[in-house]
Amino acid sequence: MATEEPIVAVETVPEPIVTEPTTITEPEVPEKEEPKAEVEKTKKAKGSKPKKASKPRNPASHPTYEEMIKDAIVSLKEKNGSSQYAIAKFIEEKQKQLPANFKKLLLQNLKKNVASGKLIKVKGSFKLSAAAKKPAVAKPKAKTAAKAKSVKAKPAAKPKAKAVVKPKVASKAKAVAAKPKKAAAKPKTVAAKTKPTAAKPKAVVKPKSKVKPAKVAKTSVKTTPGKKVAAVKKVAAKKVPVKSVKAKSVKSPVKKVSVKRGGRK
């Protein structure tokens, strides 16, 4: 017979669970992004404050140093150029409101203009270069041209109101011009009147000239006809220019007729 072994209940003791310390790792990306956003905000806040506090610059109480230097050199008119001391003295006398470091700034601008070729340095004195002299002469011309244009533009606006008056003056001038024409027309009528008077003596001369040769022809029949006919022709030839001459020439043939009558007696 098989013997049955008693079943012994074995108790299992649970093993202790060793728990390792867990390190919580926070994501690095959000940690970095948050400080950047904060830095940008702080920068913007700092940048906005000086802008609000910035004041507009006061306009300079004097022209640029380049203009002042050119003005000093041109007005001093020194052959060998003007020294720094002479230029500074001239500018100080002309410009009253200058900064405390004026002489230092003047020296810097002199060196700058020499380097750019606008000024020429000769033994410690400064001259204007040929390129710098030309614009200095051209600028006043441009200003005068602009002034002349503005002066011409102003009178151009005024004639609009006087435009109504001008036609009246023109009409008066036309009327005055028309009067001399009428006066010129009158001499023509006078000339026309004188022409008929000149024509009257011609009409008077013609009948006399016709009568005279008839009388002479009678005498020519009695004596030698050949010679007297020639004489009559000469008289007729003389009478042709008498027509163009004035009335005084008409008296001469009357005297000849009287002489011929005496011959008949």
UniProtKB/Swiss-Prot annotation:
SMART domains: H15. One of its GO terms (biological process) is negative regulation of DNA recombination. It is found in: Nucleus; Chromosome. Residues 29-42 have a biased composition (Basic and acidic residues). GO terms for molecular function: double-stranded DNA binding; methyltransferase activity; nucleosomal DNA binding; structural constituent of chromatin. Residues 1-66, 131-226, 242-265 are annotated as: Disordered. SUPFAM superfamilies: Winged helix' DNA-binding domain. Residues 43-55, 140-171, 203-215 have a biased composition (Basic residues). Residues 1-27, 186-202, 216-226 have a biased composition (Low complexity). Gene3D superfamilies: Winged helix-like DNA-binding domain superfamily/Winged helix DNA-binding domain (1.10.10.10). Residues 61-130 form the H15 domain. The keyword Transferase does not apply. The keyword Phosphoprotein does not apply. It comes from the Eukaryota. GO terms for cellular component: nucleosome; nucleus. Pfam families: Linker_histone. Its main location: nucleus. Keywords: Chromosome, DNA-binding, Nucleus. Histones H1 are necessary for the condensation of nucleosome chains into higher-order structures. PANTHER family: HISTONE H1. Belongs to the histone H1/H5 family. This is Histone H1.
